[in-house]
């Protein structure tokens, strides 16, 4: 299928590209909003017909005490906001699978599990992770894990357990990265993505806006993502949730239209990736969320909490999707 991209209000057939320049991406990102939305709509309708939205539920399995110094994160041991809790491993497995079953019953397609780690380490906790992945897959759900860096062998074992996707965000541009994180390099993130893909696991990789970065930084982040070949299977677009006790606690909320622009540009650059409207969605309001769905978002986190921040409840999201006229799995689950 040919993907159509509009330029100066004319149609121009374009195949998937992996050689974008930052200047090209910035030009897209800064287009007049109506033109940008129109172009994103053309790509979205062509590449992703049916207006179906994937519902992903997210659970924090291991919370707090992370060695990384990510400036936005309340789970970092470097920040005064650090929260921590580690249930017994046996109870943990049972509880996670119960939560996954409840998420499926509510209409979720994918169950995502998060561990606040710098890296995965072999041992009982990794074995528990593998059991959780297998259990989630047996329920008929896609399984996604986010747990920091990993080895090739660990990636292979996760693939054998049935893992659908591994989340490892780039967070921001290579140029701005050191302003946000100093305990892990950008190159280490890229290498983690390569190990995941080599194991046959799909990539979930995106970033965060609203951390003090420039428009050029946002364009640079999107450029890196769009030049991954093939494109990441899913691309979460997050708006900063400024949490007290983190270095970014005093930053203002993201302008909702800036989120719309990021979603629209991501859709144009990566036509068949799932563009996931992620953290910060509560701050957007109904109208901006609907604009994001129009611009190309075809996945949301579903449920009243993310890792450590709040999220719209299920009833609110069902109403939103119905008002927007998009379809999701919960419609079939209620029949």
From Swiss-Prot:
[2Fe-2S] cluster binds at residues 112, 144, 204, 276. It comes from the Bacteria. [4Fe-4S] cluster binds at residues 66, 70, 73. One of its GO terms (biological process) is biotin biosynthetic process. It catalyses: (4R,5S)-dethiobiotin + (sulfur carrier)-SH + 2 reduced [2Fe-2S]-[ferredoxin] + 2 S-adenosyl-L-methionine = (sulfur carrier)-H + biotin + 2 5'-deoxyadenosine + 2 L-methionine + 2 oxidized [2Fe-2S]-[ferredoxin]. Residues 51-281 form the Radical SAM core domain. Its cofactor is [4Fe-4S] cluster; [2Fe-2S] cluster. SUPFAM superfamilies: Radical SAM enzymes. Binds 1 [4Fe-4S] cluster. The cluster is coordinated with 3 cysteines and an exchangeable S-adenosyl-L-methionine. It holds the Pfam family BATS. Catalyzes the conversion of dethiobiotin (DTB) to biotin by the insertion of a sulfur atom into dethiobiotin via a radical-based mechanism. Homodimer. This is Biotin synthase. It comes from Prochlorococcus marinus (strain MIT 9303).
